[in-house]
Design a protein with these regions (language model features):
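Positions that flank functional sites
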Residues: 53
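FMN-binding flavodoxin-like domain, especially the glycine-rich phosphate-binding loop
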Residues: 1-20, 25-50, 62-163
Length: 163
């Protein structure tokens, strides 16, 4: 099952040259959050593309293997100049209670190239996943300005606040 995201529903995307939203989405849950954030802020969008199989049931199990071992997953080379943006928002799914492997790879490649960063983490549990934010901070060599943790269950989103 996939979420459908229609770019025409988000007319403000790309209206600001100062912001960028980066995302990886296997099934569309994170893509929807990324598009909403980009539309709200006028940011441009950049999708992280894995070179591994991530689609379907086999993709689910393959991604789980990377997640369990906390391995990087090969991705396409970053094709956007990250240093030209004042603010970058990274949207990531949580896999096996940790940062998704393609986003881990992106952060490693993007180290030292991002001026200011914030995170949106999408998952199916009630956690905040500060561990994933700390890992991204370490990989990027920068401290995030904010973290939003969003639970998605049965197609409904709910922001998880600190307790």
């Amino acid at each position: 099952e996939h979420f459908r995201v229609d770019a025409a529903d988000y007319p403000n995307i790309g209206s600001s040259e100062r912001r960028l939203v980066v995302y990886f989405s296997r099934m569309g849950y994170v893509k929807k959050q990324a598009y909403e954030e980009a539309d709200k802020t006028g940011a441009a969008l950049y999708e992280i593309q894995s070179t591994e199989r991530t689609e379907g049931t086999l993709g689910f199990w393959w991604c789980g293997r990377f997640a369990m071992h906390r391995w990087d997953m090969p991705i396409e080379p970053i094709s956007v100049d990250l240093s030209k943006y004042e603010q970058v928002t990274i949207c990531s799914p949580i896999w096996v209670f940790a940062l998704a492997a393609p986003v881990r790879s992106f952060c490693r490649q993007a180290a030292g190239k991002i001026q200011k960063v914030d995170y949106i983490l999408v998952h199916h549990t009630g956690g905040i996943y500060e561990n994933a934010a700390k890992e991204m901070d370490t990989l990027l060599g920068i401290t995030h300005t904010s973290l939003r943790s969003v639970q998605c269950k049965m197609g409904k989103y709910k922001e998880i606040k600190e307790r």
